[in-house]
Structures are given as structure tokens and as C-alpha cells.
Amino acid sequence: NKKIVAINNGINVSNSDLDVVGVQDFKKEFCIPNNKKIICYIGRLDPEKRPDRFLEFAEKLFLVREDVIFIMAGNGSMWAALKEKICHLKCRDNFRLLGEIYPATIVYQISDLLYIPSDTEGIPMCVLESMSQGTPVLASNVGGLSEIIEHRVDGFLFEKEDVEGVCACANFLLNDSEYLKYIGENSKSKIRKHFSVQKMFVETMRVYDELLEKSSHG
């Protein structure tokens, strides 16, 4: 009998300490006031990732509150079109289109929320990285995202077209710092427990050990 073993992606969870100096330098470089909330998009700027949906979300949320900075970090085929579209948004002064930032740790650390509006996904590293920093994720319920995020426990899942729902949830979370912190702590705990590189290594070695044991017994 053939057996398939699934092993989760793992990330380094040892670099989750807040870089206070780095945060302030980053905010200064990109003109982000300390009294602003921050929601980020991190990933490729390509059609299947739906970065245009992030713009739609930003415009809707801006109608409700103007204290949010929207960060987009990444490169891709839609860069020029997105830059042009942002220039015509009411919230254009609140946008920061940064290009690729590597490592993106500092972006997660300054952000209150990460939004993943994709039409299709596997198990994206940006979600694991964001959660490891205690930054809650709002995401389309597609691909492997439901394998990482438990809705309303350590993140939030939505139908991919439900921008209104994402907007309402983001507004609620930004108004409830205690609940936002609770979700963030749950996120960080889940990554440490289930998605660390150490756990991935242990599980991989266990599979190899089992295979070697079976082969030695013929």
C-alpha cells in the first residue's frame, strides 16, 4: 500500500522580536505617521493575486475611516496599471506602493492587518510570515488558506468577491484593539506550534526514518 504524507511548510520563527528602531526608520522613510493604522498587501502584482481587489477594498474602507495607510509591497505585470489607478483613488494620499521589500519582516511588524485577495493560492509564505509576527490575516477562502487559518480564531476567511465583508471586518478589528491582539497572539502561537522550520525538519526526518526501517525489513 502506498501512503502519502503531507508536511506543512515551515518558517523561521526566531525573528519575531519587534525591531523598534527599524519600524521608526521605515515609517520615516515612507512618510507613515505613527497615529495611522496600517493594512498591507504583500505578494506578486499579477492577475491571479488580484491586487486590484486590494485597491477596491482600500477605497471602500477609506469611505468609513481615513486613518489607514495602505501598503502594497511586491512587483509584477500589473505594477504600472496599479500605479496609474491609485493616482485616481480618493485614498491615493494614503497609499504606499513600495515595490519588493526583502525581507518583509518590517512590513508585517508595522502593519495591523494583512489582506490576501487572491483568486487562487497554495499555502503562501506571506501568510505564515505575517501570522508569525502576530499580524492577523484577512484572506480569500481559496486553495490551502483554510489549512492555515481558522476563521475568527487566528484569522479571517471570506468568499473572494466579498470585499464588503472584508472591509466591515477590517473596520471592526481596527476599532477593537483587544480582539485584534487576541487574534494576533493566536496566529503567532499556531505558527510556532504547526509551521516552524524545526517542526518541518522533525516530520521530514521521521518519514525518512520510517522508510529506512521498512526497507531494512525487506
Predicted regions and their residues:
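A short, well-ordered alpha-helix in the C-terminal region of glycosyltransferases
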Residues: K28, G165, F172, Y179-H194, ...
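A short helix/loop element that forms part of the nucleotide-sugar donor recognition site in Leloir-type
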Residues: D17-I32
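Aromatic "clamp/platform" in nucleotide-sugar-dependent glycosyltransferases that forms part
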Residues: E100, D119
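Short hydrophobic beta-strand element within catalytic cores of glycosyltransferases
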Residues: P136-A139, I149
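Conserved acidic donor-binding segment of nucleotide-sugar-dependent glycosyltransferases
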Residues: H151-R152, F156-V163, F172-S177
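A conserved mid-protein helix/loop that constitutes part of the nucleotide-sugar donor-binding site
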Residues: K37, Y41-K60, S77-K83, M125, ...
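Donor nucleotide-sugar binding/catalytic pocket of nucleotide-sugar-dependent glycosyltransferases
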Residues: N1-V21
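C-terminal alpha-helical cap of glycosyltransferases
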Residues: V197-G218
